[in-house]
Structure formats: structure tokens, C-alpha cells
């Protein structure tokens, strides 16, 4: 239902959420008081909302997402001191990513053939979220582009 909701300009009330708590693996990311930070990455969020705007819906949707978190980790929303929501229009504005899609294209089977690491411009390689296996904070695109570069230079791994 998430894809259809986004396609129709609706916000899914129970979306797929990838919940990252970065400070559990890198304590240096905690603030001066030792607070954790986390990110909720929500799949299938529309760029344009039907019948409303992101400005009108942002705060409500953050609360909705936290209520989903509360279902699986009761009390989570009570622990949140601050939020920094990045809906697609803010992602586009803040990071310059067209239509605010951090993976550039959808991560579906139909898009398994992503951008090549070696571009048509000699010596220019791509290691972005648009390359296989896509985005998130995993570094695989960079690793794979480096392997391709080594191969092109005739250097064995």
C-alpha cells in the first residue's frame, strides 16, 4: 500500500521504516550530554501531497511516525528531545537531490541495472546511491567503484 499511497500523493499511516540509531555503534556522535541520535528512513513518501502541503503535514507526520515506533518500542516518543524532518522537498532543497529521492531511483527489481561505475567520461567514476547496490550508509557503491577503477588500471585487488 505504501507505493500506491505515495503515487496518489497520500502519506501511508503505517509505513515501512528503517530505524537507525547511529550512536549505538559510534558513541562519538552523541551530543555533549550523551544523548543518542537516530534516524527514521521512511520508504514511499510522496514529493507532492494531494490536498495539502508538507508545511501543513510535517509535524503531524513526525508524530505519526513516532507513534509507529511506540508500537514496537513503547515510550520512544516520550524520549525525543528534538526532530529534524527531511521530507522529499527538503531533501531536494538541502542536498540538491532531484525530487528528494536519496537512492535516485527506486530500489526495486526493475531497477537492478543501475548506473555504471565507469562513466562515458574517461577517468570519471560514479560511486553514488544511483549505482549498485543503491544508497544508505553502507559504502558499497564506493567499494565497487574502487574495484572497477583498480581493474581499469590493471591493478589486482
Stretches found by the model and what they are:
Residues 11-20, 71-132:
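A glycine-rich dinucleotide-binding beta-alpha-beta segment and adjacent secondary-structure elements
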Residues 2-6, 76, 91, 149, ...:
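Generic structural signal of hydrophobic/aromatic residues within well-ordered alpha-helices
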Residues 1-86:
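C-terminal segments that line or cap access tunnels to active or ligand-binding sites in enzymes
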Residues 35, 57-65, 100-157:
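C-terminal structured subdomain/cap of oxidoreductase catalytic cores
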